[in-house]
Amino acid sequence: MKTNSEIENRMQDIEYALLGKALVFEDCTEYILRQLVNYEFKCSRHKNIFIVFKHLKDNALPITVDSAWEELLRRRVKDIDKSYLGIMLHDAMFNDKLRPISHTVLLDDLSVCSAEENLTNFIFRSFNEYNENPLRRSPFLLLDRIKDRLDRTIAKTFSTRSVRGRSVYDIFSQAELGVLARIKKRRAAYSENNDSFYDGLPTGYQDIDSKGVILANGNFVIIAARPSIGKTALAIDIAINIAIHQRRRVGFLSLEMSAGQIVERIISNLTGVSGEKLQRGSLSEEEIFCIEEAGNTIRDSHLYICSDNQYKLNLIANQIRLLKRDDRVDVIFIDYLQLINSSVGENRQNEIADISRTLRGLAAELNIPIVCLSQLSRKVEDRANKVPMLSDLRDSGQIEQDADVILFINRKETSPNCEITVGKNRHGSVFSTVLQFDPKTSKFSAIKKVW
């Protein structure tokens, strides 16, 4: 890792190069000045030059060596002479090392240097705090303090980075990561493999997947229903489709059921042996053979179940990051949202809002779909048709705002059919479809059409 002095020297070089480009190239002057508004300059001379450039720009005055020098004199800035501005202009125009580098690349380099500086400071201060009193202080208290410092470091780093906007054409045309490149990759995936889910995952249900990409990368997805309607069953069914049939990596955080109970549901789903028979043990030799075969099937899958009773939001967020970093999961399921506790404890509504915002941010940060199960309020029971609505989401309207997709399950107890309604879809259409539900195996399937 670089030392602070090395990072600071590099940042001063970038400051110099950016101010030179702002002085010479009028087409990028405004952009550069806008990106440096909240930047903490490492060189006081560069800070004063930036202030002068911004003053000239804000007052519709030309930014030249002469105009900048006159303004510096008016402000009685004594540590800069006119020759420094002249050299800055010359280097921006003719220096072989500086001239070819675009201002956007320099701004990216400055963001990286700022992040390195923040990270170095975080490690240094955390190490010093540990060494101050390593034996007397509770390790849990120390970890909490380090975690708080890390959160502040991350917030500072990304708040500075997010200030910088980009032109529409840059976003469209950027190599590898631009919109055009992504569209071409989607087309290639569809043309070569008939794959319509380059940026996401199919649920495994044709009636849903043909109408939209629900599990798009970065999506925060809510599956909502009243108790005992099939939220967990649907989540497990989709997880099986992704992990076993699509050979992708899945993380499943169960706050309600044990890992063993989840696996029993998976076995029942795969074998068709009812959950009740698995619990009672009233199994035939043929059924035992099917269960062993199912074990061979799940052995080669990458479905990771976490059920260690971690209800605190910060611990769940850390667990999700570890699943992404260590197990490289493609999707996360959480069962369920109302069991999570947040440190924002003014009231339950604010707590749920904090949980929702955090999970939404994690989905975007890790660029994977996060699917969270949620209960509905009792208002849906008071409605004549029992059809769920967005306003039925329990405890907080923030869930409705944060979610990219909200999927409702509606099932009459006497009917084997479930209505699956996409009540919100930020990036596509809303729709409804019907799936068949087998309560014995907790399995959803397409309704067989009779011709």
Swiss-Prot record:
Gene3D superfamilies referenced in this protein's UniProt entry, alphabetically: P-loop containing nucleotide triphosphate hydrolases
Residues reported in the UniProt entry to bind ATP: 225-232
BP GO terms, sorted: DNA replication, synthesis of primer
Keyword Hydrolase: yes
A GO CC annotation given for this chain: cytosol
EC number: 5.6.2.3
Root EC class: isomerase
Function description: A replicative DNA helicase, it participates in initiation and elongation during DNA replication. Travels ahead of the DNA replisome, separating dsDNA into templates for DNA synthesis. A processive ATP-dependent 5'-3' DNA helicase it has DNA-dependent ATPase activity.
Name used for this protein in its record: Probable plasmid replicative DNA helicase
Species of the source: Chlamydia muridarum (strain MoPn / Nigg)
